[in-house]
Amino acid sequence: MKLTCVLIVAVLILTACQVIAADGWFGEESSCWWCTGQNKCCEEAQVCQSVNYACPPARR
């Protein structure tokens, strides 16, 4: 019974990791989902930074 529970939990964790990675939660698609307050999103450079500074050049 314990082995079954461990396997179920492992499958759920792996599935959650795949969903997170596929949805771009780590910034692959957009790095600005967490950019708030006195910050602005610089999509080309994939950074979030202060509104007081210009966006850096785009990443290659």
Curated annotation (Swiss-Prot):
GO terms for molecular function: toxin activity. It comes from the Eukaryota. Disulfide bonds join 32-42, 35-48, 41-55. One of its GO terms (cellular component) is extracellular region. Its main location: secreted. It is found in: Secreted. The keyword Methyltransferase does not apply. Expressed by the venom duct. Residues 1-22 form the signal peptide. Keywords: Disulfide bond, Knottin, Neurotoxin, Secreted, Signal, Toxin. Probable neurotoxin. Belongs to the conotoxin O1 superfamily. The cysteine framework is VI/VII (C-C-CC-C-C). The presence of a 'disulfide through disulfide knot' structurally defines this protein as a knottin. This is Conotoxin Cal6.20.
